């Protein structure tokens, strides 16, 4: 079989269709890059290894943040020079080429390595989170500015972050599974991936956030849509967790969260008024982002406590999410794509 037809067959879930695929002229997604995910101890969060000026570092995968950022600790460690001058400055994409960005206070990076790709002459925003790189055991956030122009394959079962080209036949992406597949329309609001979900029979909107440790629901949705009431057996305080205004954060065990037929059973979800952040002192806290210039938190934020149970393919060109239950380990078809490239 010709190499191109073989690649097309790899991206079709039924082997019986390979003969038909060879005759088709539509393209399968182009495999671009892969990185091995590494779990953050004590949570379901995932980092990927990167190199910054030749030094090994770890970046947290954060799909809801708009801009890739580096920690103040890494800036000090590597002696990265600060800059506000952006003329001619460029950012890395997964092919190793670059794109212009708006002027912001940043640091200069001579070389950044992501998987098999490297870029040079880069600038990155420095995070104002002083715990990044210290109490938080990663050195930066790998965010949506490096995702939006590509298909992103989050294979949590195999612990792989894969990049594919966005130009392909609609639906011709699920190479990994015979398991039930959910095809979900996505709406991008800023950097956030919004999807419809069903919880206990009620349809609400959700944001996919790989940077969130826990899945959380806005309190008014819990009370008005699901009839929950604070300080009752069905909505008890989540330990001593409080938001930025000192209000109690609650939790509730729902029966079923469904993504177009791919189900997560008995999810325990935090219930809060304000968006989830980390407390700078210790543990988790919540801080209000419902300010005049910012929208309210989403109805539901799906965090890594649930996402790690799934295989999620973000098809940016189609504006669709392809989701199955997570597998165990790398699939044979993925190995066939990666091994010849020496990745």
Language-model regions, residue ranges each:
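Positively charged n-region of N-terminal signal peptides that target proteins for export
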Residues: 1-4
